[in-house]
Each structure stands twice: as C-alpha cells, then as structure tokens.
Amino acid sequence: MGQEICVISFSGGQDSTTLAIWAAKRFKKVYLVGFDYAQKHSVELECAQKIASLLKLPYEIIQLDFLENITHSALFKNSNDLIGHSHVQNKDLPNSFVPNRNAIFITLLHSYAQKLGANNIALGVSQADFSGYPDCKEDFIKSIEHALNLGSNTTIKIVTPLMFLSKAQEFQMAKDLGALDLIIKETHTCYQGERKILHAYGYGCGECLACQLRKKGYEEFQARF
C-alpha cells in the first residue's frame, strides 16, 4: 500500500504544481505539504491552498517561522536585503538561499510519510534550471534519502521527475498533462509576492530571479515546442 502513497513538498509554484498533477496520475493517494517559513512571498501559501482545492488533494501547512530567527536569507520577512546579491553567510550563494531549508523540509516530509505509511516523497527540485541552490542537486537528494532511511530503518524513496528538466520542458510537461492554463494563471513563483500583473508566463514582478527564470523558460517553450 505504501508504494501507492506519495507525499509532496508543495509551494503552489510552477515546479511543485506540475509535480502534483504528474503524481496524481501515478499514485493512488497524494498528500500535499506546504511550509510557512516567514517567507516574504507568503502569498504562495494562498495559491497552494487554492490549487490543492482545484486538484481535490489534501493539503497541510507546517509552521517553520522560527527559521528567520536562526539563519539569514533575503527571502525572510524580517530581512531588508534586496534579492539578487551574494549571501551574507556564503558569498558563493545567492542571498535568496535559505540554509538547510530543503534538508528541514525533507526531514519533516520523511516523518509525515512514515505516519501515513507512504513509501514515496516527491520533490519539484531541478538542477537544470535552478537558482544556484546546492540543496536542489541530485547528489544532495540521494544523500539525504540514504541518511534518513538509515536513521529510520525505512525504504522511503525520494522521487524527483523534474531534476533534469529545464523550465521550458516543464511548461511542455504541463501542456502534456493538460494543465498549462492552470500553471500560468494559478501558480506563484515571484519572490516579491506580486499577484497583480499577469504576464504571458504567469503572475510576478518580472524582475526577480524567480520571475526571470520562469520568463526565460516560457519564451524557450514557445520557441521550441
């Protein structure tokens, strides 16, 4: 039965929504989990709730707002840093990086999967078109899967079907799934939380790194597919 249940890290963005629709066609039961970590773009949680309702999938929010008190990121509400610069703790990373965020998310998803009797966790991470975050890479995902299973005596799989897809390929995947319109109009990616301006690729400020990646991907999708 556990092979038929999947727990998904769900932000309401392009990646995780495409993933949720993909998973709903492959698993008997899918559970969506969002995280409130005091992010500036908390509007994504509202989008996630609406999308979960549209997809008729159960959705839980886990509170992690303590993160802004123990580490640095320009994504936190208490930060006045402008997104687009180097991280104060590591100059090789963008300041939108939240240290250990994915490690925390995945650890909690792993615990929840055990409670549900699920043997699958699905993540919308990609190292093809990503924001320079090391915790989105395949080697990290494989390592934490191994570590958590060792620590829990489990065999839970972490599934990452978007790992080597570009944003353009993700738009094509959404089209193939019959969900392109939903991805464009309902998902949220913008770090600034902008939901007033609808571009061809979706809502957003059009300037932040997240919007730039999404815009570039959509333009490539239109040109290639």
From Swiss-Prot:
Its cofactor is Zn(2+). Pathway: Purine metabolism; 7-cyano-7-deazaguanine biosynthesis. The keyword Transmembrane does not apply. It comes from the Bacteria. Zn(2+) binds at residues 190, 205, 208, 211. Belongs to the QueC family. Catalyzes the ATP-dependent conversion of 7-carboxy-7-deazaguanine (CDG) to 7-cyano-7-deazaguanine (preQ(0)). This is 7-cyano-7-deazaguanine synthase. It comes from Helicobacter acinonychis (strain Sheeba).
